[in-house]
Design a protein with these regions (language model features):
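Conserved catalytic SET/PR domain of SAM-dependent protein methyltransferases, capturing the structural core
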Residues: 1-173
């Protein structure tokens, strides 16, 4: 995390959040979502064994995840995001983010899992959660990209506001 530009503190969204310490301009890199890259099998093992929670991971390819470092885990979700993931794991400002403003991205733009495989292994759907953001356009549930409303999927795809693997999968479907 770019500690010079960001700070972690109590969030109005949920738990801790990441906040801008200076103005971050639209299109500017905020940070890389860093951690250990693991396979889907390792992702499942760590969750089953209670080593990690499913929200500790960022999906970066069909069967690859990053077990994010603690500071990246503090970046909250919003249905009205001011940031997005570009490429593989680069968090970028979607619009100008003012000093003191919390940074949040739409978690649904980073998930496209084989729910049947995950459910079989874990006994539950992976990574479906209630939204706590409270924005006017709140969807109430955070889930897979392909389950987003079609108009929102089209917006994210057209504007390339999702990781490369999501954009590639969307082009095939």
């Amino acid at each position: 995390m770019e500690e010079d530009n960001l700070e972690i503190r109590k969030s109005n969204i949920s738990g801790k959040g990441v906040f801008a310490k200076k103005l971050i301009k639209k299109g500017e890199k905020i940070c890389f979502m860093e951690g250990e890259e693991v396979s889907v099998e390792e992702f499942i093992r760590r969750i089953k064994e209670g080593i990690e929670k499913d929200g500790d991971f960022l999906q970066v390819d069909n069967e690859k995840y990053i077990d994010m470092k603690e500071s990246n885990r503090c970046i909250n979700h919003s249905c009205n995001p001011n940031a997005f993931i570009r490429g593989k794991n680069e968090l970028v400002a979607l619009k100008d983010i003012n000093k003191g403003e919390e940074i949040a991205y739409d978690y649904s733009t980073t998930m496209w899992e084989d729910k049947d495989e995950i459910k079989k292994e874990l006994g539950t759907d992976a990574w479906t959660m209630k939204c706590k953001g409270g924005s006017k356009n709140c969807r109430k549930i955070i889930d897979q990209f392909y389950l987003l409303p079609k108009d929102l999927q089209k917006y994210y795809i057209k504007n390339k506001l999702a990781p490369d693997f999501i954009l590639k999968k969307s082009a095939k479907n």
